[in-house]
């Protein structure tokens, strides 16, 4: 369940900024039909930053309910306060989520020892499998391979989502981690195929929100070692990988999902604003290049 194409699911909202349950069901059904390996609910792409804790939990619980056991659900549970991250994580004990994705603390920029103690405390507070999440471009905090290796020794820390886009990190982590069952996942669609060729086991993907079948196929080709065919598919998807970040994520991907009829609105809460007209043209062209329009 922690390998292959895992979607970092967008959170559909109505015109008032409340969760659009009908669109959420439509998105989940789309991923079930497409063969997506799992859903990450309320991560960065799911707008965790603009949901309060009760709303955060509610979205995950609605996702679980609508998934109905058809697809595994991973809860995003990151915070820049350890006690807050523990509290949020514990709210998902015995709910049916298969694990938690926990981002490094953002803004306060802890030292490597602080990162170790943070994730260790979270893992020791629950039996749920934990996926570390390193995305320094957003958090201002880079969890280095030696710290990841230390954390990999903790029983229920089972994987890392590495979103630096730095492919040398794959081999650096592999050299340092003793546990061959520890899973490396790419958090960067544009370099995901190369990441898997170096030993990664999948992608936690933004692109999968709108190209679910294609990302499932890409990850399957990588798992089979068919990188020649995978590269051909990835070249077709590359404009999407890149231009879904033409403005801050998830602004472009929510617009694209609405454009493709996957959900009713591309509403976001402030400070996120609608996709600009010049960016719409760029994303539209990427959708056409990928064969989605």
From Swiss-Prot:
Its EC number is 4.3.3.7. It catalyses: L-aspartate 4-semialdehyde + pyruvate = (2S,4S)-4-hydroxy-2,3,4,5-tetrahydrodipicolinate + H2O + H(+). The active site is at residues 133, 161. The record marks 44, 107 as: Part of a proton relay during catalysis. PROSITE patterns: DHDPS_1, DHDPS_2. It comes from the Bacteria. Pathway: Amino-acid biosynthesis; L-lysine biosynthesis via DAP pathway; (S)-tetrahydrodipicolinate from L-aspartate: step 3/4. Catalyzes the condensation of (S)-aspartate-beta-semialdehyde [(S)-ASA] and pyruvate to 4-hydroxy-tetrahydrodipicolinate (HTPA). PANTHER family: 4-HYDROXY-2-OXOGLUTARATE ALDOLASE, MITOCHONDRIAL, DIHYDRODIPICOLINATE SYNTHASE. Homotetramer; dimer of dimers. This is 4-hydroxy-tetrahydrodipicolinate synthase. The gene is dapA.
